């Protein structure tokens, strides 16, 4: 029996006259959106035919909606790529309702950056250490909802390290959380160090705690795992930190045409080494730390390879949604 497998349509060796769509799992203004727009500006330069590029924001369910779209609806013709919450791999691991993708089957371009996750407080508040914060009752933290680092990082600190937080979800982007903080609607926020650093530099917020991923300027902050009071808490925090090694993932749909995928991968790597992109990123205080598609898949496999008891425990504390 001879089987003929249908392949994705291919249009040859040029993107001339085409437009690349970059799907983003969050609304405009947040970190994922900023990286997508930076990539959209420089990626076409390294694709034959110099195509156009547009960003399509598709928020919802902490990026699960966008990931589902990229996996099963977007055409695998090389004209659609996307970026979504790095923690979607945890959503797949714990079998979150609504997940209809397999991250191992995406056509990976890689990641634009790794990043630390930090917890910060407003600088006008008197809290300067983790121990100061432990003494506060109902410290108010704005979040973009379960499944995001803005939510899960403080939620795990509350569960396993003795903090008393009042988490306020529902903000549609990290930029909206920061606006709430500036208006003093909330006392603090967590999330990507890269996204929060400009506000640290401005003196708006003060970093207090980080995850195991470090970066210049926050090396001496206490690590969440070291504040946990149980082995279970330390383990969950450790596993939850793994995806931050691919904090800004970029993928194409599964079965993307091989010739187009090779061009996209090459262009992605070259764009992230472009001197003008790097200068613009530095000006915008955005870290660029290219991760290859092969290494990104290794990180995904590491998370998805957790034993059943760890998965069961993670599922108790990590949720996804708005």
Predicted features, each with a name:
Residues 1-6:
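Bacterial N-terminal signal peptides
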Residues 11-105, 146, 150, 159-190, ...:
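N-terminal (or domain-start) structured segment
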Residues 27-29, 86, 117, 122-127, ...:
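Short coil/turn segments
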Residues 35, 129-132, 257-268, 277-281, ...:
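Short amphipathic alpha-helical coupling segments at ligand-binding clamshell hinges
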Residues 79-82, 118, 140, 187-188, ...:
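Short, Asp-centered acidic motifs that coordinate Mg2+ and/or phosphate
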Residues 89-97, 111-126, 155-160, 245-251:
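Periplasmic solute-binding protein
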Residues 104-145, 161:
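A conserved helix-loop-strand patch within extracytoplasmic ligand-binding domains
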Residues 114, 196-272, 320-322:
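C-terminal lobe and pocket-closing loops
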């Amino acid at each position: 029996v001879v089987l003929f497998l249908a392949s994705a349509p291919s249009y040859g060796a040029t993107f001339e006259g085409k437009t690349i769509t970059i799907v983003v799992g969050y609304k405009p203004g947040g970190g994922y959106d900023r990286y997508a727009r930076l990539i959209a500006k420089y990626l076409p330069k390294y694709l034959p035919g110099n195509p156009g590029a547009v960003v399509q924001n598709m928020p919802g369910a902490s990026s699960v909606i966008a990931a589902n779209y990229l996996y099963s609806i977007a055409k695998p013709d090389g004209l659609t790529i996307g970026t979504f919450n790095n923690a979607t791999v945890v959503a797949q691991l714990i079998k979150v309702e609504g997940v209809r993708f397999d991250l191992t089957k995406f056509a990976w371009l890689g990641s634009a950056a790794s990043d630390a996750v930090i917890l910060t407080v407003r600088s006008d508040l008197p809290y300067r250490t983790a121990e100061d914060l432990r003494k506060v009752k109902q410290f108010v933290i704005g979040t973009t909802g379960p499944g995001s680092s803005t939510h899960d990082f403080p939620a795990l600190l509350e569960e396993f390290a003795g903090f008393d937080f009042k988490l306020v979800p529902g903000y549609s982007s990290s930029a909206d959380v920061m606006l709430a903080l500036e208006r003093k609607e909330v006392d603090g926020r967590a999330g990507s160090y890269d996204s929060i650093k400009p506000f640290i530099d401005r003196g708006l917020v003060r970093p207090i705690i980080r995850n195991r991923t470090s970066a210049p300027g926050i090396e001496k902050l206490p690590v969440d795992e070291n504040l946990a009071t149980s082995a279970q808490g330390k383990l969950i925090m450790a596993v939850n930190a793994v995806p931050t090694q691919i904090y800004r993932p970029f993928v194409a749909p599964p079965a993307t045409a091989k010739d187009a995928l090779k061009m996209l991968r090459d262009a992605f790597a070259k764009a992230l080494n472009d001197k003008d992109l790097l200068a613009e990123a530095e000006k915008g205080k955005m870290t660029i730390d290219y991760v290859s598609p092969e290494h990104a898949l290794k990180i995904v496999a590491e998370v998805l390879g957790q034993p059943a008891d760890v998965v069961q425990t993670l599922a108790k504390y990590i949720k996804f949604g708005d």
